Amino acid sequence: MRRRPAWLGVPGKDADGAVLLTGPEAGELLKAAVEHAGGGLVDWHLDHVDANPGQSTTATYQARVQWPAGERQELFGMSARASGPAVTDSRADIYVDGSREVAVWRYPDDPDLPGLSRAAYPEQMAAIISDLNLVGARVSAQQINLHMIGYRPRRRAVLCVEVNNRRFYVKVLREGI
């Protein structure tokens, strides 16, 4: 009989994933996700939790990852739902065994904020600003100063964009909102 991984929790308990995603077992799942992506997990800590008791839990983690090109600080997210994965969870990696299913993603590839992966990179933001003619001229990624103001995983993100002595705030929302 195959041993059940600790990160799956006890069958029938912790349906919303709160215990798993806020406890030390989250590290095992994070390690599996990082290795699946081609890296090695150096260390990690819980960053943020959004809980809907009995329904779902989403957590983010700050992680130091050793990639083939070097070590980087990364932000990972995980979600578990009592009712099983949502349609948008298919945009993340799903770890499954038995009844436990956990969606895992690396920022900015939030499964409920598909626009975030476009807004979070200077190259993509330069194209948006240029296409919308927001500063009266085409801009390059080198002209963009971009930083995250706030991020609520699976809900919204706000970024500050500075270019040509102008400042813009970009809010990324879920589809249909």
Whereabouts are the PLM-identified features?
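Phosphate/pyrophosphate-binding loops and the adjoining catalytic core of nucleotide-dependent enzymes
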Residues: 1-177
